[in-house]
């Protein structure tokens, strides 16, 4: 989803380093340990990033002045090659809520370690994940297991969208909890992908 971009004036030290060309890759940004506070950092270093809206919900709240309605959106971003982000946004306008969610997803960007962790495969290419990982959000628990090449993404529609944007092609997924709650289903998948970086082994990318 494209939006009109204004000229970027960096407000953080990390942003100024990226704008000045002192940092030239998203890997350097993530390795620095500094939080990404400006989405333009991601726009500049990952120009091929895609986004997908996973859910739009209307949220109502009673106030002294009456009933207030906002839209809550859930968005995932990724470049289909090892980087993915998850975010949500709220606003009285759907378009603004989506844009806020996209910004938050970029600020929450992570690198996913990919590999061939299936004993049935052993091709040593980055088509799956290197290890079994689990993520939780609310009542939802998602476990991702390495799958051999050609199996595809054996999971529900929501995790499949997250995994595709992360660049994962083959995986087995097992779920528990209220998976009808899109926000928790997507976040649990994202949290599982975070865990791929906890163990560094050979044959990962």
From Swiss-Prot:
InterPro entries per UniProt: Ribosomal_Su5_D2-typ_SF, Ribosomal_uS5, Ribosomal_uS5_arc, Ribosomal_uS5_C, Ribosomal_uS5_euk/arc, Ribosomal_uS5_N, Ribosomal_uS5_N_CS, Ribsml_uS5_D2-typ_fold_subgr
Alphabetical UniProt keywords: Ribonucleoprotein, Ribosomal protein, RNA-binding, rRNA-binding
Domain notes: The N-terminal domain interacts with the head of the 30S subunit; the C-terminal domain interacts with the body and contacts protein S4. The interaction surface between S4 and S5 is involved in control of translational fidelity.
Descriptive protein name: Small ribosomal subunit protein uS5
Disulfide bonds: none
Function: With S4 and S12 plays an important role in translational accuracy.
S5 DRBM domain boundaries: 49-112
One GO CC annotation: cytosolic small ribosomal subunit
Coiled-coil annotated spans: none
PROSITE patterns recorded: RIBOSOMAL_S5, S5_DSRBD
An annotated Gene Ontology molecular function: structural constituent of ribosome
Similarity field: Belongs to the universal ribosomal protein uS5 family.
Originating species: Methanoculleus marisnigri (strain ATCC 35101 / DSM 1498 / JR1)
Superkingdom of origin: Archaea
């Amino acid at each position: 989803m494209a939006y009109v971009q204004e000229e970027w004036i960096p407000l953080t030290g990390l942003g100024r380093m990226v704008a000045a060309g002192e940092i030239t890759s998203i890997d350097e940004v993530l390795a620095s340990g500094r939080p990404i506070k400006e989405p333009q950092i991601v726009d500049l270093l990952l120009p091929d990033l895609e986004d997908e809206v996973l859910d739009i919900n209307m949220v109502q709240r009673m106030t002294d002045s009456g009933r207030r309605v906002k839209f809550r959106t859930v968005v995932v971003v990724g470049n289909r090659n090892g980087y993915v982000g998850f975010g949500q946004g709220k606003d009285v306008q759907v378009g603004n809520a989506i844009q806020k969610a996209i910004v938050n997803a970029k600020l929450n960007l992570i690198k996913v370690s990919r590999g061939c962790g299936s004993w049935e495969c052993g091709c040593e290419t980055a088509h799956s994940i290197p290890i079994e990982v689990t993520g939780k959000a609310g009542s939802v628990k998602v476990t991702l297991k390495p799958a051999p090449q050609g199996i595809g993404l054996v999971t529900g529609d929501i995790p499949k969208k997250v995994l595709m944007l992360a660049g994962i092609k083959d995986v087995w997924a097992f779920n528990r909890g209220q998976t009808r709650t899109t926000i928790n289903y997507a976040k649990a998948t994202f949290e599982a992908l975070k865990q791929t970086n906890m163990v560094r082994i050979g044959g990962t990318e």
